[in-house]
């Protein structure tokens, strides 16, 4: 039919619709076909039908059209059609099988697309829909009573395209949405309304279409966002609707039955005789009675079933007598119930009914079978004692089937019957029978529904009631069964599933769950246990203390040792044989080694399978190696040995997981770690080897088993892992778990494969080996070391190993503590095997175990010499070395490469503390001693001491060198203090050579001295941080010292006065300088006591290096010894008027030792003026200074030919001047640096005298201040008025200097901002900090007043009180000043005073007079000029270079930190006098002009050198110099 096709079409289209797709459609319904026909039909009954199908809550309310109407076809918009969607009104979609008596389906108008009901405008025509009242609120979606005939299509947009949707909406939206009311109309009025709606005004429809489009779009957008929620809600509602639909169907069925009855009565009245009516009425009565009987019967059956269940429940509760007592009753009950049922069936059917019904007593036609189906499932449980749950399910299923199938039966059977009833009375009877069947089915359905509801509501309460009332109920069962007529459904609650079955089921579930839980628990416990064990093992492996590891290692080693003593003995013998064999056939041996590697891998794999232990692998590796080395030894013995050993280790594995690594010193293990036994080329196996993971925690080297060691002579190489021996040596050592010493057997090459962690410096750091297993074949060979007969180049470290056994007893015992590369020269000469003896190498910390170097490995117990020589293999050393290498610092190891051969005994005696040898060399060897106990070669270099220095020669010469070093260091320190040639930074204890013969090498370092050029190269090759620059620098220094010595001490002396000399330095030189008559008074002879009592002026700046301090102390002591004359010198010598030109040559200081002389020469200040000619030679740095390699600060004095103003720098410049250095010098009224700062402030203003500070060359950039400026600065902190105007002659560009990058020694001008009260900051703020910092590196202390560690302004620490007092010009205790002076200028102590310099320390002036430390010009100015000499410009002004009183020295020390250059401004007359006087400077009391010397930092050594040259020859000051 049309309706059917429409419904099917809509259903199909609806099936294709999905919630994800949101069609925004505004559909105008075209004229509905058949509308007129529909209108023609008038249904007798108008009823609002309820939805038959579960519909989403959002779906349009189902519309039930009257039977007579033809459901309208669902309109199919083109868009919907194109999309495969049809939204429309479907007829009979909910009740597919229900037809009216005339064959018309019940019309249920349903929106086809329940999913999209919310998003799609309702397709139900307005005023057509009878909205289900329950869903009215949900169906109030925009509906349009009027729609255009033409459909308006709206594009389809995915849910996420909001922007596109908005754009379309904007385009299409022409008017505000018009909302229409949804009118609920009866179905009968639908067609007229429809016609009206078709004829609506096109304008209105158009507007509405637009508004509908807008609304639809908006609705679609909203729906798209809420689609998921709606979908869920729809699902829930659909389920609810399903339930409600069932109820509706039941109700409708009842109504249909009523209708059928009515129709029957009508038809009977119309077509039948009265007799038929009577019969029909009788049939109805009988049917009603029968239905009642059936209902009662069903109720009784249910009671019966419940009673049975109750019985079983009670029997379950009372397992004993109840079950026995009542079981028979259950059988009776079943029989009685059956009989009762039969009675019901037979008695319930009257004779009249029998005529209509088949003799069977139950209608079999149609769906009569349902009754049987219903009864049978219910009866079945009686015999089966099954839970009623199945029955419930069956009933539910049957009820559904009955609901679905009965309507079909009705429409198929009843409709024709009624049509033909008028023709044949038999048809009435059939109809009556079917009606009876229907009634029966309905009764069953009613009962079933009732039972279902009742059961659901009373399940829980019934359970409790049944359990409680079982006994009584069971007792009363027979009477109840006798009274089946009573409806008992309500009286007796249907029993739930029997307790026994439930209990059984629950018990099974519990048991299964318990089982699962137990299994899970076991799994969890296993996991936890495994995790705990692994954690424990890991903790043991990784977190174990070094001592614990060592202890475990020892225990394991001892046990293994005991187990394998015999095997080790055999291995030792085999090793000896193998060594001989290797010596004879090295190449064959190499091939064997390769095979051994393969075998070792195979054996390792096998052992791993057997042991499954990491320690096993190393053991197996060792085993394979041993097998190859010991071809004669039965493999079975090895297997047994290794298995036992591995088992023991496995036992200990948990306690000592890392012990395996230590144990794994076997050759195979080594081969695995270090690659192919030949050790040539890259060892690819290292990457795969598991040991690397254990490397860092690698057990410390195991006690060395005694090894037969060939006499090996060669440089000691510390390998990160172990020192490898040549293959031949390996034969001897191989039995001892061979370390990487196992090297190229044929070539006797040693590979040092560092097992230890890669030192932070893997590069050419001294002695640091790369702990990682790197193909050692690449290691660099130390060029200096003796070329081994067989040399394997290992990139990580140049390792030269001569496998041949050198006649010289081998010195290269490797230090276990620090696995540094030990260069083992195995001389090709192979000593006779008889010489071979197994020696246990004590662990030797060649590096003099640096604190960091003490690693777990280092904490090795004494070597276990007990091990058989074969077992002497270093087990832990690889790991230990890797750890130790990190600790050892580069440079310390290779300090000396010496050819000295020491006996093993000596070496051992020297190094008794090292119990475990890292290097195990086949042949005779000596344990490397900590080669150098003194400060490590470059103190700046890493703290680790010489880790793997070549020990051969060094060990023999070590004591001699140390003794020489002690003396030499003392001498050198004194010489350096005097000359200040070496920067404290560069100070290297060994490097400074005492003897001039050694000067070149010694200066370079003791290492060079001991090792020779080749040895020093070894340091470099080994990675020692000695730069070629450093070496060349050291050599140059030595050369410069030698040249200076050759030139003579005179220049050095000149340089000394030029630089601020420490009192100690002055003391040394003092005897040479005759005291001039005039000025000594100004400088009271307090100085000599001051030297002793030097107030400890603490330079807040960096303290001198330890060596420097020690040097100072020694120098002071020596100077006190040599400087007993100092007191005489203390009396100040009046500065002779002699021109400074003569001064430099005149300075006659007792020639210091050659080294000192050289150093003194070096101290000669560089010519800060560069090439500019200085007006006075005084300004020129003494020629000695030229020789000075790195004079730190060049003090240059420029004789002021010009007015003092010219000498005076603008105060802004002066402020930058570190007058701190000035304070360093004693306040000699004329020239003392401190005095010069104060005095010069005064004096410089007095006259433009030559500014020569006692022969001091004026460094370039040095600024001279007039006394006026100094005074002003002292009074207020540096005020910076533009003083450049006074300096116009010399400082015309001073103001511009602010904008120029500061020159080397330039003082940066400071803006005039009042007084900067921090003396240090005030000066440093002005100083170019960079030059100051450079000076630290570039200049020697001799030439600078600043200490080595002196910091630039920002870096400089706050001055101590004493320092501030010095800066402020307040006297500090003389002793401290002396101490600081000596500390700051360790090398000056020995220098002789320059001719003008007073040999005795200047007397300490008042606070104003003496500056105790570097002073700011402001501070100098701020201080009252207490020094009467300065204030009066006494003719007795001291020469600037006068030996500084302790206070001066102290101030110098402080100033030295600042590294200012102090330019002493003296009167030319003084300088002339000095020059004229020659060596005996005497100050003329009538010096008219005062010199102010400002010591400025000069940053460039070259500049300093130039300044020196200028000091010597150039009268012109360099452009950088400012006066």
Swiss-Prot record:
Compositionally biased tracts (Low complexity)? 1137-1149, 1236-1251, 1507-1523
> What is the tissue specificity?
Ubiquitously expressed.
Known InterPro entries for this protein?
TALPID3 (IPR029246)
Q: Which domain of life is it from?
A: Eukaryota
Record note on disruption phenotype:
Failure of formation of primary and motile cilia in ependymal cells of the prosencephalic choroid plexus. Centrosomes are rarely found near the cell surface but are often mislocalized deep within the cell and do not show coordinate orientation within group.
Q: Record's Gene Ontology CC terms?
A: centriole; centrosome; ciliary basal body; cytoplasm
Ranges annotated as biased composition (Basic and acidic residues): 1373-1386
Protein's cellular compartments = Cytoplasm, Cytoskeleton, Microtubule organizing center, Centrosome
Tell me which UniProt keywords the record has, alphabetically.
Answer: Cilium biogenesis/degradation, Coiled coil, Cytoplasm, Cytoskeleton
Residue ranges annotated as compositionally biased, kind Pro residues, are: 1073-1088
Q: Does the keyword Ion transport apply?
A: no
Spans annotated as Required for centrosomal localization = 498-585
Recorded coiled-coil stretches:
428-466, 499-528
Which residue intervals are annotated with compositional bias (Polar residues) in the record?
A: 1-16, 1099-1108
Instruction: From the UniProt record, give one GO term of the biological process aspect.
Output: cilium assembly
Specify where the region named Disordered lies, as residue ranges.
1-20, 57-84, 1070-1112, 1137-1262, 1294-1313, 1373-1410, 1498-1523
PANTHER family xrefs: KIAA0586 PROTEIN, PROTEIN TALPID3
| Similarity section | Belongs to the TALPID3 family.
- What does the protein in this record do? Required for ciliogenesis and sonic hedgehog/SHH signaling. Independently, involved in regulation of cell intracellular organization. Involved in regulation of cell polarity.
Associated pathology: Defects in Talpid3 are the cause of the spontaneous mutant with pleiotropic phenotype including polydactylous limbs with many unpatterned digits, vascular defects, hypoteleorism, abnormal dorsoventral patterning of the neural tube, loss of endochondral bone formation and embryonic lethality.
Official protein name in the record: TALPID3 protein
What gene name is listed for this protein? TALPID3
